[in-house]
Regions:
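Conserved, well-ordered alpha-helix/loop/beta-strand core segments that scaffold catalytic motifs
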Residues: 30, 35-63
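Alpha-amylase-like alpha-glycosidases and glucanotransferases acting on alpha-linked glucans and related
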Residues: 1-38, 63-205
Length: 205
């Protein structure tokens, strides 16, 4: 979508109405595909659960820059007025890579997420809990602190650690889904005492 015409990249409310009308057939087709998938998946999940099999789903912490999420809600991300990221995700240098890993995903504007009581995130978890019995948070450590890299960097060397939402995020999660939400914390990468403390405080395996 970053290469679309401006009226499609950043449509006004009235332009959205025109787009929805002009692309009605295409939109309905995509909705049908989504409905078909969810119907088939719910049947598969029911089949597994009836046989005492639990499904573990993955929720990656970051989304792609060209995703519908960034297009629909650019305020949730650190992007410029055209939708391009100003800082991106990655990890610092380690034993496996002398220059780190430059993932390129746009980073969240956590201050804005906090103002909205993490509504987008809670909706995301709500959907994932419908699809899976247990949810694994991919790159859990990024909710404690994450590696922020200038978007014009060619490697991850110029990054820095920035605080994530930490306790506040998980307290909101508990308020939304109960004391023991079915979550697994992935612990790959640079795991510090602070990351372990956050995991243990909320009893996440």
């Amino acid at each position: 979508w970053l290469e679309w015409e401006k009226k499609y990249r950043k449509p006004t409310k009235s332009q959205k109405a025109v787009i929805e009308r002009d692309l009605e057939d295409e939109i309905l087709y995509e909705k049908f595909l989504q409905w078909t998938f969810f119907r088939q998946w719910s049947q598969l999940k029911a089949y597994a659960n009836e046989r005492d099999i639990l499904l573990i789903g993955d929720i990656p912490i970051f989304v792609s820059g060209d995703s519908s999420d960034v297009w629909a809600e650019p305020r949730l991300f650190q992007v410029d007025s055209d939708g391009f990221p100003t800082v991106v995700a990655g990890v610092p240098p380690d034993y496996f890579s002398a220059t780190g890993q430059l993932w390129g995903n746009p980073l969240y504007d956590w201050k804005y997420h906090k103002k909205t009581n993490y509504t987008w995130w809670m909706d995301r978890f709500k959907t994932q809990f419908l699809l899976s019995d247990i949810v694994r948070i991919d790159h859990f450590r990024g909710l404690e602190s994450y590696w922020e890299i200038p978007a014009d960097s060619e490697t991850a060397l110029n990054g820095k650690w920035v605080d994530g939402p930490k306790d506040d995020f998980f307290e909101t999660l508990i308020q939304s889904f109960g004391e023991e939400p079915p979550i697994i914390a992935e612990d790959l990468g640079i795991i510090t005492d602070e990351v372990r403390a956050l995991r243990d405080k909320f009893g996440l395996p």
